[in-house]
Amino acid sequence: MRKLLAILLVVALAVVGILIGRQSSRVDDNGHFLPPDTATLKTAKPVVRIYMENSGSMNGYVTTNSQFKNALGHLITKADGFYSGTRLDFINQGIFHTPMCDDLDNFVLNLNPASMQVGNTSSTDINKIFKMILDHTSRDTISVLVSDCMYDVDNVGNLLSAAATSTTGTFMKAIRRARDDKHEFATVIMQCMSEFSGNYYEGNQAIACNGQRPYYVIVMGNLEQVTDFCHYMELEDTATGLPGLTHKYMISSEPTWQLDNMTARIFASDFTNAVRIQANHDGLNVRKVTIDQEQSNFNFALGLGVSHLFADLSYLLDKDNYEVEPSQYKITDVNDEAKFTECDFFRHPICVQMVVLGQNYAPQLTLRLKNKVPAWVSECSYNKRLGMLPESHQSYAIYEMVEGIYSAFYNSMDTNSRDLFQLQVKFEGYE
């Protein structure tokens, strides 16, 4: 009997020991595992707020089944399908939410000059509109403005310059708020074309217009969220983006992107001295260059995998947008036509052709893509009242508006962070 009790006591002690061990293990593991009733936290999708400017100058876009309506419907449908809580409002001197705005599925079907008559539609204060929108833009909010984006001031004295300066100040405050909230800020400016049937306002003069007119879609918010939005909406490619999309430009407070051997390769294929470049194992830096003394110059090229940059191809192919140092290196051409084996893993590589003048070699070159207002903005802008319809692709003072936004970002960046990207290539030896 005593022997049986002893055995039972040993078993009981063993069970207690196991239970204590398990409990101890649970306590120790609390730092690595969530309690059973705790759900894994995921980053929430932002809320998308779409603002349609409804001043009288916008009426001409909605009198027919225009590309404007098609693009707006495309924008609303895709945003509402991907983001929960998508909200649509009219905006002019204030923000107005009508019952029509709640019916996202049928909003465009019901859109016409009469249904847009809410608030003060007699004039446009684009700076006030920007301020109202940016005051409602936070880390988890993507704001989208659809507007013809015209300053309602004449270029008399310093009025237009003052309006652009006000735009700069409004966006600088938004950038500062974003940084205070520990994130970077971004703005995307897209120009779209649409049929227009109505009055075009050249200052206070109403001019009948039946033809194509530009308007703008401007996306503002957290850089990461805006980048994702552009990807989900397929805005990188003009063919899959908004109907009527003609130009796009993205600017952010993010520091300069440093390219490396995963985004750039050096090659000399299709050049007369192709065999004389021996690339390093990384495919970018050069282990050895054999110099032909009979050649006065040395030609080579860089293949860049930068197609995901949110910019028009025309911007990426404009060699005036690039800068190279030291001065003996010159850019002779930028194109997307050359096909090289070295760049097969790049999607739509950009080829930057270069020359070293007079065999005056340097051990390192630095290539930069400058961040500046694209040429299309100037081409699509006029700033003096004409008294008649402008060219179909032109908007009044759109350059001043974009320059105002650009200046806000430019002034908020360090001097060495104002390029879109920078690339350094080392030449280790010559013979």
Feature locations, PLM:
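Von Willebrand factor
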Residues: T40-S147, Y151-D152, T187-I189
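Eukaryote-biased recognition of electropositive, low-complexity segments
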Residues: A178-A301
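Extended non-globular C-terminal regions
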Residues: A264-E431
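Extracytoplasmic/secreted cell-surface and envelope-processing proteins
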Residues: M58-T63, F96-D102, Y151-S161, F196-Y201, ...
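A charged, solvent-exposed segment within the mature domains of Sec-exported extracytoplasmic proteins
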Residues: I133-A206
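Acidic, polar low-complexity linker/tail segments
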Residues: R2-R49, G56-V62, F421-E431
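Well-ordered, non-membrane alpha-helical segments in soluble/globular domains
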Residues: T64-L75, P113-K131, N158-R179
